[in-house]
Amino acid sequence: MTTKNRQIKNFTSNFGPQHPAAHGVSRSVLEMNGEVVERAEPHIGLLQRGTEKLIEYKTYLQALPYSDRSEYVSMMAQEHAHSSAVERLLNCEVPLRAQYIRVLFREITRISNHSLALTTHAMDVGASTPFLWAFEEREKLLEFYERVSGARMHASFIRPGGVAQDLPLGLCIDIDSFTQQFASRIDELEEMSTGNRIWKQRLVDIGTVTAQQAKDWGFSGVMLRGSGVCWDLRKAAPYDVHDQLDPDIPVGTRGDRYDRYCIRIEEMRQSVRIIVQCLNQMPSGMIKADDRKLCPPSRSRMKLSMESSIHHFEPYTEGFSVPAPSTYTAVEAPKGEFGVFLVSNGSNRPYRRKIRAPCFAHSQGLDSMSKHHMPADVVTIIGTQDIVSGEVDR
């Protein structure tokens, strides 16, 4: 009896971009040895819209809506990064009430983002009930968006110098009512997943990232804290009124998908805590900087005097000029450190606005995180990275 040596070749498989579990228009090429993934190569650029170039032809105020559409799940965090960069170049001081409103809605955005990320991640594993439960609560958060801006998603609410308008009557009461009942909703989600045997089998020790790997790849947010690195810009480099608030920063130990799940659950609890602190500490006062070149007057005041009409007309047509230096401003967005490198040449349009997108850094870890796992695990690894293609491709 003779034996023959046969060389087994790996084969490649396309995952996405049309696959519903690809979390957007993303494509990955998987090199597989049987049912084991040997290599996963993300192919980006399918949702590239030229955002950074388009902004160079807009005024600083007209550039704001592009921030909403860059990462369309946590919109106000991107608005805040752009507005803060402009304010830093202008050396503009934002009123205290506006700072509290900004923090309030950024934490509402964080809850909205995590509730979507966690429950779509659960659907990747095979659990559909948490998704339906969470969307009932997320609908309330989008209604809060709508009440302050008129839009459910692309709000353009956080603007250079402050916020677009003050909180409508009764909104703070409704937000407080939401915080009182949302903790029990988180408990229900945990009851479905945290101790579930199948859930833990699919998540524990899968997609592991060490602390050094997370630093080398430029991870931030939950992806960094899940690997045991306690780094949160709200604590490490406080902005707005974060130095007056007192949340806890959850940190993982193993760096696997289960740790990142637990951190997102706890971050929703801490966001509720921050929202309650903002509601209790928020003072009365102005919600825009007292600079009519930067912040136009309200429409009601515009009809009372010629000066108000002029001050309302100029910012929306010509815009305002920003001094020539450059600045880098970063905020702790729900997905990680979202940064804006803004270069001004002294005109009313940015010379360059470079976006530091956390999802772009996280996507490069897909190969290492997927190695020697099954194709079904690749789906959930993309889910635990919480990637949005619009932010990756810009």
Swiss-Prot record:
Region (Disordered): 1-22
Bias (Polar residues): 1-16
GO biological process: mitochondrial electron transport, NADH to ubiquinone
Cellular compartment(s): Mitochondrion
An example molecular function term from Gene Ontology annotations: quinone binding
Predominant location: mitochondrion
Subunit note: Complex I is composed of about 45 different subunits. This is a component of the iron-sulfur (IP) fragment of the enzyme.
Protein name: NADH dehydrogenase [ubiquinone] iron-sulfur protein 2
Species annotation: Nicotiana sylvestris
